[in-house]
């Protein structure tokens, strides 16, 4: 029995080492005794900020994803430590929402000094943002601690819009996420916008001779080129979900199937057998009557993502200000 327990501990350790998924003591309601108002404070600040910025749900959801994919979900993307700051990495281009996290942190420090981590604020804010976009409500396991490292060189393996589906699957697998998780987390693009900067190659240099990506629906191509003309303003933004950019739903998956994906990486989900099957599984007439719904599976995927490389116990710290190490 002792030998069996030892083997089990070794197996769990290997899962953590190779995949970065922490099996440590995150738990729903972690702050119920030490700061019982923590989650309500996060929700109130996020809801108030969203009144003046309808894009905030997408902004905070993206911030959570980018935080977790570098050094785990430890708030490392929030730190300002000069030119080497992780947030300055090209892979984090356009990531925003830092001031919202700081606003939440300031209120939490006033109510419960030194208790709630910045990394938990990011995860909770993303949850509340999704709810504001009419997405699923879910419980967030908390208890993360903040990392003590923030360096742009560590963000070199962030998923990029030009990545092939094979590269994307490999990058997600490195984080302990499978092909199904890839589809579900990519479907977070159901809310938000992207810049024409990320569209140039797909529209004007995808094939020899300056031809566009052939997977773009021919009826959609003129719309994209009008919004993002060749040699035009690369900072112009367009919705990633053509029909419901501010509503969290599975329309993005239908768009991917029909050739209306805006991003190359989203379109690639329908070019791979495994990910195509996942996309189709949420679009059949029998879904959601038979099998899990897109919303329920998305919750599982984002909670799973929120456990990547977390620091708990005596690891890391609880920052007093999210933009600076203690």
UniProtKB/Swiss-Prot annotation:
This is Peroxidase 43. It is found in: Secreted. Substrate binds at residue 159. Disulfide bonds join 35-112, 68-73, 118-322, 196-228. Heme b binds at residue 189. It is an enzyme of class 1 (oxidoreductase). Ca(2+) 2 binds at residues 190, 241, 244, 249. Transmembrane segments: none annotated. Glycans are attached at residue 151. There are 73 peroxidase genes in A.thaliana. GO terms for biological process: hydrogen peroxide catabolic process; response to oxidative stress. Its cofactor is heme b; Ca(2+). Its EC number is 1.11.1.7. Residues 1-24 form the signal peptide. It comes from Arabidopsis thaliana. Its main location: secreted. It catalyses: 2 a phenolic donor + H2O2 = 2 a phenolic radical donor + 2 H2O. GO terms for cellular component: extracellular region. One of its GO terms (molecular function) is lactoperoxidase activity.
């Amino acid at each position: 029995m002792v030998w069996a327990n030892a083997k089990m501990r070794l197996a769990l350790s290997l899962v953590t080492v190779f995949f970065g998924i922490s099996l440590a003591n995150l738990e729903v309601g972690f702050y119920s005794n030490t700061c019982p108002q923590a989650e309500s404070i996060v929700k109130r600040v996020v809801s108030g900020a969203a009144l003046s910025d309808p894009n905030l749900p997408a902004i905070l959801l993206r911030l959570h994803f980018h935080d977790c994919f570098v050094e785990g979900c430890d708030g490392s993307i929030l730190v300002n430590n000069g030119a080497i700051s992780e947030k300055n990495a090209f892979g984090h281009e356009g990531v925003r929402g830092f001031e919202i996290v700081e606003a939440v942190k300031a209120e939490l420090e006033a109510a419960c000094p030194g208790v709630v981590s910045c990394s938990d604020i990011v995860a909770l804010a993303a949850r509340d943002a999704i709810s504001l976009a009419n997405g699923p409500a879910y419980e967030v396991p908390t208890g993360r601690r903040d990392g003590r490292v923030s360096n742009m060189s560590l963000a070199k393996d962030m998923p990029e819009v030009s990545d092939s589906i094979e590269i994307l699957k490999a990058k997600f697998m490195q984080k302990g996420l499978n092909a199904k998780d890839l589809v579900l987390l990519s479907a977070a693009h159901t809310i938000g916008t992207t810049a024409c900067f990320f569209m140039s190659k797909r529209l004007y240099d995808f094939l020899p001779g300056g031809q566009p990506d052939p997977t773009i629906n021919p009826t959609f191509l003129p719309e994209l080129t009008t919004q993002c003309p060749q040699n035009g303003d690369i900072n112009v933004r367009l919705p990633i979900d053509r029909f419901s950019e501010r509503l969290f739903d599975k329309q993005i998956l239908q768009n991917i199937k029909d050739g209306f994906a805006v991003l190359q990486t989203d379109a690639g989900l329908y070019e791979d057998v495994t990910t195509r099957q996942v996309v189709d599984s949420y679009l059949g007439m029998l879904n959601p009557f038979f099998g899990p719904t897109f919303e329920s599976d998305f919750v599982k995927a984002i909670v799973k993502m929120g456990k990547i490389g977390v620091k708990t116990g005596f690891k890391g710290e609880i920052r007093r200000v999210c933009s600076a190490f203690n």
